[in-house]
Regions:
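RNA-binding accessory domains that recognize and position tRNA/RNA substrates
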Residues: 1-177, 187-233, 351-356, 380-384
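Short glycine/threonine-rich loop-to-helix capping motif typified by GTGT followed
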Residues: 52-56, 250-251, 294-298, 347-359
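Active-site adenylate/phosphate-handling loop in enzymes that bind or generate adenylated species
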Residues: 122-127, 161-173, 244-245, 249-323, ...
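ATP-dependent adenylate-handling ligase core
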Residues: 14, 68-78, 111-112, 206-270, ...
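The feature marks non-catalytic terminal segments
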Residues: 332, 336-384
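Generic beta-strand/beta-sheet core signal
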Residues: 203-205, 238-241, 282-283, 312, ...
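Conserved G/P- and acidic residue-centered "switch" motifs that form tight phosphate/ATP-binding loops
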Residues: 183
Length: 384
């Protein structure tokens, strides 16, 4: 009797001729997630089995795999010979002592002498005799015992399903550059896009010494949380202090946020292209803050020359975003009270619906290209 973990995937079976590519990416991502743990991953009949591990590490393996996009459900199972006595011993081990239950059997081995219903009925009856605190409920059971009879002469016995992260394997839908701040929104945006199979790289803008090193460390932690779902990531760190000082010195203060965001988008696009990214990703949510009006988004987006901008949070309210932040494990980090660059020289009344003619007039007061080049020269790259 060996403990194994059954991993079932989400949408890969829909991919037709590309299915092999998606399955290989999925298996590679699971291997990366389990790095440092002795194990073997084997594909079997439209699912994967994790085998050969120290049984004391089964919970850690499930925890790691729960962050791998593409995982639909998992089950910690016992692998036994396709023999009714062996199957019953495994069922007795994984089942509770009391409550309601039913047995569900899937019989891939059509040579087995009993059909699925007969197996479920016999095993269920034997379990009732063995554990007097159990009762059968086929409609709304507290426990569902699964039995999978495989074609290789083994049976997998498990108690229930563990929900995975869902989505598609990271790396199957290209690569994008996430503008990540120290707030709640941007890590959630990156998480949502990664769930659809995109590899996510990050870029962060800081204003040291106006912002402190704790603010930077906070962003590194948030990027590390995201990296747990994306099989690692790269964090690009760019200093924009000189840009803010120039805007503060030469431009109407009401346009500080608008002008700074346009610089960020230009810089992000250039670094994204060099890194092989195919889009930019932001945590903007329509109407959530003053700068995130449609006019503000149009202003910042208009400077991006050739990459699409993905804004996955546009239709979410703040509570929905917070729920997702909590679920991914980023919220407690995001709410630490360290300021980011957007709070430096923040005007009392920032322009909410900027007009393009006014923006261009303010921008004409600046050496845009020179400021961009100076910012890019400060680039630091961290592998997480």
């Amino acid at each position: 009797m060996e403990k194994v973990i059954i991993v079932r995937y989400c949408e890969i079976h829909l991919k037709g001729n590309n299915r092999g590519f998606f399955e290989r990416s999925f298996a590679e991502n699971m291997e990366k997630a389990l790095r440092g743990i002795r194990h073997e991953i084997r594909k079997q009949s439209g699912r994967y089995l994790v085998e050969g591990f120290d049984e004391a590490l089964s919970e850690e393996i499930v925890e790691r795999l729960s962050k791998v996009f593409g995982v639909h459900t998992m089950s910690v199972a016992l692998s036994v010979k396709s023999d009714m006595d062996e199957i019953f011993r495994a069922v007795a081990e994984v089942s509770p002592s009391e409550g309601t239950f039913k047995v569900e059997t899937h019989r891939a081995d059509k040579k087995f002498p009993l059909n699925s219903m007969q197996i479920s009925a016999e095993i269920g009856g034997r379990l009732l005799d063995y554990k007097k605190g159990l009762k059968v409920d086929i409609h709304n059971p507290q426990t569902v015992i699964g039995i999978d009879l495989r074609e290789n002469g083994t049976a997998l016995v498990f108690n229930g399903l563990i929900r995975g992260a869902g989505g598609m394997p990271v790396g199957t839908a290209g690569k994008g550059m996430l503008l990540i701040s120290g707030g709640i929104d941007s890590p959630v945006a990156g998480h949502m896009i990664a769930k659809r199979g995109m590899k996510v790289e990050c870029i962060h803008f800081h204003s040291y010494p106006y912002t402190n090193m704790q603010a930077r460390e906070k962003v590194e932690e948030l990027a590390s949380v995201l990296a747990g779902y994306t099989c690692g990531t790269t964090l690009n760190i760019v200093k924009v202090t000189h840009i803010q000082e120039e805007i503060h010195k030469k431009c109407n203060g009401e346009y500080m946020v608008t002008l700074l965001r346009r610089f960020m988008m230009r810089i992000a696009e250039r670094i994204a292209k060099k890194s092989g990214c195919q889009c930019l990703i932001t945590g903007e949510s329509l109407g959530q803050v003053a700068s995130q009006t449609i006019e503000g988004m149009t202003s910042s987006g208009s400077v991006v020359e050739s990459l699409p901008i993905l804004r996955p949070l546009c239709g979410f309210d703040k509570n929905e975003i917070i729920e997702r932040s909590r679920a991914m494990g980023a919220y407690e980090i995001s709410i630490r009270p360290y300021e980011d660059c957007c709070t430096v020289f923040l005007p009392r009344h920032p322009v909410i619906r900027p007009k393009m003619a006014d923006i261009l007039a303010e921008e004409a007061k600046l050496d845009v290209e020179g400021l961009i080049k100076e910012a890019i020269s400060s680039l630091e790259v961290l592998k997480l």
